Amino acid sequence: MKWLLRLLAITLPIFIAESAGAVGFQYLSIPDDTGRPIELGIWYPSNSITAPTTLGDVAQTVAVNGEIAGDHLPMVIFSHGSAGRFTDRSESALVLAKAGFVAVSLTYPGDNYKDSGDKVVQILLNRPRQTSRVLDYMMQTWPGRDHLEKSEIGFYGFSAGGFTGLVAIGGTPDWKLFPVHCAADPLEGVCQQGSAAVLSRPQVAARPVSEWQHDARIKAAVLVSPGWAFSFDPSSLSKIKIPVELWGGSEDHVVPFESNVGYLQRYLPHVIAVHDVKDARHYSFLKPCSEAARALNLEICSDQPGFDRVAFQESLNRDLVRFFRSELATDK
């Protein structure tokens, strides 16, 4: 469905309802380990004057390059799904910034709405590395780094971003499990994609586990419809010690609940909460579509009859603030 994501990216901006509290925003680019640009959006508390601003495919009232307000600020990094972009969780980033967090979201080189040309194995290997590269920048080079509480780093990942998060917090894929699962459940969404044949090859399963980059700086994670979760080595999952919150949809046929969220619930030792969202489809976890996008009847904009995506997203954002406030507090 990558073409749907690309099409959504060029639709009219979505204007997000604002509440009290000023938010600053910075847009910049840093190189990954191969020199390709990683696009970043950074939201943070600010006392500077705000103005309506277009940020890619969304519009928000923010203080572009405004001064940072506060010290010892916790940070949450956002990881988009396949062929996404840094604005995919822009409303969540805004809400977290208003609540006193720094929120940073990246666009993954080789797996985004403009360029998804990397091969699937390379994408899955690169994503955790690029995530760590962003954390390196934020904590070592970003001009606002002295405002951060560097021991309070959270992660949010959707779909392929959920896979990225599982690797980052210590999980190791065992690709021998992939063809076994797909043979038993061929209707699993990722088993029907073109990449399934690649991930089922013996040479993929034989790749060394040392290729997967973990990042111990992440202290709490929210994983939403985490893709390929059933292919993770249970023993590696059992060693993950940080708190994790899991979300999935009862009508998600791309990343079905039981074989992914349910699988992780069985093996992760510190699952704080599991949310099986009634009537939610895979794309129900993305921000609400603009009217122009909905008029095109895109699958990415389609929800079950009666499912209120706007109300659900507001509830999800409130929970993100609650979870990260609770689990990132160093004095809890």
How would you name each of these model-derived features?
Residues 21-78, 88, 273:
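Domain-level recognition of soluble alpha/beta enzyme cores
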Residues 120-146, 150, 167, 176-194, ...:
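Alpha/beta-hydrolase active-site loop
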Residues 157-161, 165:
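Gly/Ala-rich beta-loop-alpha elbow adjacent to hydrolase catalytic centers
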Residues 240, 246-248:
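Short beta-strand/loop motif that positions the catalytic acidic residue
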Residues 267-298:
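Catalytic histidine neighborhood in serine/cysteine hydrolases
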Residues 291-332:
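Catalytic active-site module of serine/aspartate enzymes centered on a nucleophile-bearing elbow/loop
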